[in-house]
Amino acid sequence: MQVFTGTDKVKRGLAQMLKGGVIMDVTNAEQAEIAEEAGAVAVMALERVPADIRAQGGVARMADPKKIKEIMSAVSIPVMAKVRIGHFVEAQILEALGVDFIDESEVLTPADEKYHINKHLFKVPFVCGARDLGEALRRIAEGAAMIRTKGEAGTGNVVEAVRHMRQIMDEIRALALLPDEELVAKAKELGAPLELVIETKKLGRLPVVNFAAGGIATPADAALMMHLGADGVFVGSGIFKSKDPRKRARAIVLAVTYYDDPYVLAEISEDLGEPMPGIDVRKLSETELLQVRGW
């Protein structure tokens, strides 16, 4: 049977291959090599990690194509890159560069406050963030092949990632108990297509892989998110803003694999050096929150 590249089935299948793994933010080829050596299943190429974007402010855009190509040349694992919400030209550029996945990310400054990218128009699979089931299903309806919790990137504080993962999982469990007669009304409430609501109820999970992201800084954080139902984790600032990135990267990869073994977790959490300085999310103003970007 002939398989056509770029179909939803193929794109979702590519994302499935990353299940159970760790995807790490990197800003140069050296960091990408450290991530690959540590066992990352993919790297996210970007100009600045979320902690620096938060600290420095300004408009955060797609990374320089030269930097992305350098990272792609340095590693054999898949390379992802971020685009601004709604900026389909940035996405076209990344597809032309040959990246393996595109993240339409709230971490970058949104380019369009009305529309997200129509991801069905691209052959490359997309990753998108979500805080709840409705948001996740709307992104999947637009063509996303992978969902991740938004969390609150660049804080080193896992509380929002926990909140978003619990919210999505709780809504899926509630959906499973809903009579079929109420699904049309539920789809309208979620702002999502009925067929995706039906599929989610039938599967008892999202139709695509759902990774955890936003504030994961320690092996324990990564293991916690796996316990809550994540298919894998993204780690942004938590690795390369720590004292010993190489050791912490390896520990987080092992934590995702052995998340259900506290003895292994205790061993790998030992002597990692200082983690990244964290931010109390409660002290952030509404304008400082990244998770509220998108709809």
Swiss-Prot record:
SUPFAM superfamilies, per database record: Ribulose-phoshate binding barrel (SSF51366)
Gene Ontology process terms (BP): amino acid metabolic process; pyridoxal phosphate biosynthetic process; pyridoxine biosynthetic process
InterPro entries documented for this protein: Aldolase_TIM (IPR013785), PdxS/SNZ (IPR001852), PdxS/SNZ_N (IPR033755), RibuloseP-bd_barrel (IPR011060)
Main enzyme class: lyase
Binding site for D-ribose 5-phosphate: D25, G154, G215, G236, S237
Binding locations of D-glyceraldehyde 3-phosphate: R166
The UniProt record lists the keyword Membrane: no
Reactions mediated catalytically: aldehydo-D-ribose 5-phosphate + D-glyceraldehyde 3-phosphate + L-glutamine = pyridoxal 5'-phosphate + L-glutamate + phosphate + 3 H2O + H(+)
Pfam families: SOR_SNZ
Active-site residue numbers: K82
Pathway membership, UniProt: Cofactor biosynthesis; pyridoxal 5'-phosphate biosynthesis
Family the UniProt entry places it in: Belongs to the PdxS/SNZ family.
NCBIfam families in UniProt: PRK04180.1 (NF003215), pyridoxal 5'-phosphate synthase lyase subunit PdxS (TIGR00343)
Reported function: Catalyzes the formation of pyridoxal 5'-phosphate from ribose 5-phosphate (RBP), glyceraldehyde 3-phosphate (G3P) and ammonia. The ammonia is provided by the PdxT subunit. Can also use ribulose 5-phosphate and dihydroxyacetone phosphate as substrates, resulting from enzyme-catalyzed isomerization of RBP and G3P, respectively.
Name of the featured protein: Pyridoxal 5'-phosphate synthase subunit PdxS
Organism: Dictyoglomus thermophilum (strain ATCC 35947 / DSM 3960 / H-6-12)
Organism lineage string: Bacteria, Pseudomonadati, Dictyoglomota, Dictyoglomia, Dictyoglomales
Encoding gene per record: pdxS
